[in-house]
């Protein structure tokens, strides 16, 4: 270990290529991933009229309950696959408003232990591998750290750039080189222009430095908007999923001349005021708006929903199996009924 600029350099971590070689995909897993990618892209480019659900825990805290949740999703998917494409959330990096608290499995593969980034890299790859190998699900994760994306780049079918990251140039440029759909959230202050600009950047080609290399990207035509609500100047929650909000985003897309104009609506966060049970009403309201307006139906490709095995949330050290240790989530019974209700109304 050596110290520089008030940073203690503990050890050099393996590069993504080394980790992928040690924990590889089989040929059959690669084929499943490729087929999943195409089915998801087809929704965003309009060649499929299926509805996307990016759904799962706020944070992937332990492998066992996450995989139990995914096993239940797999059984449920069989009932709705003619209408819905399910993309499980396996969020292994968590942004924190103040920088404090549990930062996700990458940092702490054991939430009760000290951070261990090497074990975290292995743990998140093994978890995503298990979801694909055992259940046929390539999943979604948040790109909190652009330089870490390639540890999972061969496993993810959907990537989200969060509200705190969406204005960052490295996130935008990295998104332009990702081969799967990347959702750009509106920023915490709610400026839709910032969100649209981030999509423009992600859909454009760039040359920049990435992981010590000079790289060139072609642009990501599947980059799109995620509406998650925002905090106004007075610190109040403001939602942006309503009928008129969706029409406003549709107008912004028309003016921007972007490819594959699309919106995913996040039913939690500031859209729900972090009242997790509100996600049920919000999800149904958005489906209703789609059914009332052909432009909204064409624009809104799906929902992002936070759910887990148990309702609500708990402290990091409480150890209730399948209960969130970050934001509160819908429990399984409510989740199952909501997905069936959504499918029935599409």
How does the language model describe each region?
Residues 1-45:
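N- or domain-start disorder-to-order transition segments that initiate the globular core
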Residues 27-43, 76-87, 93, 117, ...:
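N-terminal beta-rich core of secreted/periplasmic extracellular enzymes
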Residues 44-47, 74-81, 129-134, 217, ...:
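Acidic (Asp/Glu)-rich catalytic clusters
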Residues 56, 265, 331:
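Conserved, mostly hydrophobic/aromatic
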Residues 58-61, 260, 268-274:
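Short acidic, Gly/Ser-rich segments with clustered Asp/Glu that frequently serve as metal-coordination loops
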Residues 2-3, 11, 70, 83-248, ...:
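Active-site-facing alpha/beta catalytic cores
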Residues 308-346:
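Internal helix-turn-beta structural module
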């Amino acid at each position: 270990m050596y110290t520089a600029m008030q940073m203690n350099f503990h050890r050099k971590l393996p590069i993504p290529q080394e980790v992928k070689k040690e924990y590889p995909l089989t040929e059959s897993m690669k084929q499943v991933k490729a087929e999943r990618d195409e089915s998801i892209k087809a929704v965003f480019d309009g060649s499929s009229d299926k509805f996307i659900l990016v759904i799962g825990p706020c944070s992937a805290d332990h492998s066992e309950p996450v995989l139990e949740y995914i096993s239940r999703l797999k059984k449920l998917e069989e009932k709705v696959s003619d209408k819905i494409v399910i993309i499980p959330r396996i969020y292994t990096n968590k942004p924190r408003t103040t920088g404090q608290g549990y930062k996700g499995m990458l940092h702490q593969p054991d939430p009760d232990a000290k951070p261990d980034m090497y074990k975290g890299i292995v743990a998140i790859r093994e978890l995503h591998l298990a979801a694909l190998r055992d259940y046929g699900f390539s999943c979604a994760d948040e790109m909190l750290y652009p330089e870490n994306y390639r540890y999972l780049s061969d496993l993810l079918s959907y990537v989200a750039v969060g509200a705190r990251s969406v204005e960052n140039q490295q996130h935008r440029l990295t998104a332009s080189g990702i081969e799967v759909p990347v959702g750009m959230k509106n920023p915490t202050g709610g400026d839709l222009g910032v969100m649209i600009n981030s999509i423009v950047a992600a859909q454009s080609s760039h040359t920049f430095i990435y992981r010590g290399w000079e790289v060139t990207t072609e642009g990501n035509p599947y980059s799109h908007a995620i509406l998650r609500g925002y905090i106004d100047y007075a610190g109040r929650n403001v939602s942006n999923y309503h009928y008129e909000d969706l029409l406003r985003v549709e107008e912004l897309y028309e003016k921007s001349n972007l490819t594959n104009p699309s919106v995913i609506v996040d039913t939690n966060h500031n859209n729900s005021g972090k009242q997790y049970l509100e996600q049920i009403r919000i999800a149904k309201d958005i489906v209703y708006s789609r059914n009332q307006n052909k432009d909204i139906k064409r624009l809104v490709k799906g929902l992002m929903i936070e759910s887990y095995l148990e309702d609500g949330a708990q402290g990091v050290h409480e150890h209730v199996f399948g209960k969130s240790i970050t934001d509160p989530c819908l429990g399984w019974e409510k989740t199952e009924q909501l997905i069936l209700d959504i499918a029935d109304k599409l």
